[in-house]
């Protein structure tokens, strides 16, 4: 049993390190922007370059992971991410286009890596029970990596020179890459054809969007991640302005991490609060999330801000988990788990790119960060109202 668990353990560590660095690199780039005199809103523009590979490569990365040995795909993903960080050492860091190129490269690595980390699990487990536990563990390692990547990784990036924090990021990606060599290589399906699979992706996409339950869940989870992505960038800029905290302080990333703690708590309690047979009731928590988003930018008391960010995360966690569960369950039956995740990634990242673009435009025309956060809240409200109307199609 121990011998079989070794590759799984290596996969968990690979995933933890890679996801930690994915979250830390955002803070490295935020510091580079600040050092070069760019406005905090520019981080939203740079963030879009990370989301775009998920949109453009979505139809191809699943087939790529299935065609080749998945452990090799993990190596390739980490290598591309590491290349994105290496570019930071050689580019003109005062050029926004060059910084976008680096983050775009990291995004390409992330989108290549993503399907393989889930797709390899059935190859490393013997039965459905083992697979279920392995899935739960990889999710737990990912959540822990997001928390520590924002809190710890963000703090390291804030307290060290960009050159040093970039070096640490690179080292973490290389460590993650090293761990993948403990995972056995199992042959992929060489008969897969990219053209046919890409066409299949859009047919499956249509299939999921035509069914009310899966369409509701795809739009709902997409709206949640759009808001989360914009909030992360906006709150990073908002904390120093509203709470008077030095942007280079350790506290900034810790305050930002409270939202993730809230999401974990919400995700944990969601099954007790929302029965799956009435999963659309999670919309109530979506409206709760909207209310807090439009309220919290007007406080300047740190403790109140932390409580509200914790609460917005909690509301978001309860909002998203029932929809995620229904989507994975229905999607698995309709088109398969891997394809459902690929379509979900496509929609989420498309909306994250759109949301970040709208946030950037709002700040570009001179509206305050607080006003832009409220604007994002109103965008979320638009999606929620659409889902209220759409809910009538679901007979549950």
Map each language-model feature to its residues:
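Cytoplasmic membrane-interface "Motif A"-like loop-to-helix N-cap segments
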Residues: 67-80, 272-287
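A single, central transmembrane helix in multi-pass transporters
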Residues: 28, 160-166, 206-265, 318
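C-terminal ends and interior cores of transmembrane alpha-helices
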Residues: 79-94, 287-301
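Transmembrane alpha-helix termini and helix-breaking/packing motifs in multi-pass membrane transporters
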Residues: 27-37, 89-90, 143, 147-169, ...
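Helix-loop junctions on the cytosolic side of multi-pass membrane transporters
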Residues: 119, 123-124, 166-195, 388-396
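Juxtamembrane intracellular "pre-TM" segments in multi-pass secondary transporters
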Residues: 1-9, 185-219
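C-terminal transmembrane helical hairpin of 12-TM major facilitator-type secondary transporters
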Residues: 280-320
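Substrate-agnostic recognition of the 12-TM MFS/MFS-like secondary transporter fold
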Residues: 9-26, 49-65, 69-82, 98-158, ...
